[in-house]
Amino acid sequence: MCKVGLSKGKVIVMPEQGAPQHPAPLRFKADWGGANLTRAAGWLAQWVYEHTADQRLSVICTGRGMGDNLRALGTGEVDVAFATPASFARLAAEGRGPFAGRPVPGLVAIAALPHRDAMVPVVRSDLGLRTLADVAAYPGPLRVSLGRDDPDGFMGFGGNAVLEAGGVDLAAIVDRGGTVTRHEQPFDAVHDLREGRADLMVSEAIMTPDWQQLAAGRDVTFLSLSSAEAAVLRGRWGLETIDIPAGYFPGLREPVTALNYSDWILATTRDLPDDTARLLARAIIEDGESFARGYRHLPADYSPLRYPIDYRSARATALDLHPAAALEYQEADRVPTQVA
């Protein structure tokens, strides 16, 4: 209940003493602001607003969508955060790789949204390099382009892990007169190779037009991981590979095995209240199509969101589920749900 008063001719709505206060905004952390994770956070923020009696607001903080987002959960800066690839979240929970000595305590998941992606090394075909072993043995200088190498830079860590699995020593490349260029955005590495500034690049976001343009406009070779190299990634980091089918890129005649860089994990901590965790899980169960329809103009295999969103697969994440989210999914299994 509110009282209405007058002040200098203006009507003022005043809450009565003791009236309940609106809850604090739900704090999301997403990506730089113009990409998919911010879009996903906006979808969930609207769901929260529309499905809380007090129309709870949200704050969407921009980030990198990588290790910084998961660390923000650990420090209590935000309540929920998206990060990609989903598999790297396990490294955060375990304090390994880019999180060595700095694990994120209590890290759990609400869901993982479907995003089919890979971290792929690509080289100029005229160099005659067909494998990472060839790259490691190449005696001349090479210009290499890949993601930023810092504690929060998943693209840099992923690129390094791929090259190291094949025995490629970036320091040795520099010693031979080569260069290593690092970028924040995956497309910059792709552009370096396409525009002749690099001989080898390692990058992701393979479903985007930039990769199609690279394959169509340059004579390049996609380097497939060997079974031994895949075993190194699995044994050292617990990371899996994914197969890119022949024909996915123009001129790709054989499948390519690459580091799996898939899915957008929606992470939180065990401190997130149960009702909030259940509400977010309910969005995954009931409202996925509201978000997915924004991508359906693209073929599913070339869409950043590999629609549809099915909670039965979305709940299978690299992290344990928040207990309340897990209960919500279990209830959905028992009761048929009308999805949007």
Predicted regions and their residues:
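Short, low-complexity disordered leader/linker segments with a strong preference
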Residues: 1-23
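Pocket-flanking alpha-helical
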Residues: 45-46, 60-101, 187-193, 205-216
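Ligand-binding clefts/hinges and TM-proximal coupling segments of bilobed small-molecule sensing domains
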Residues: 134-161, 241-307
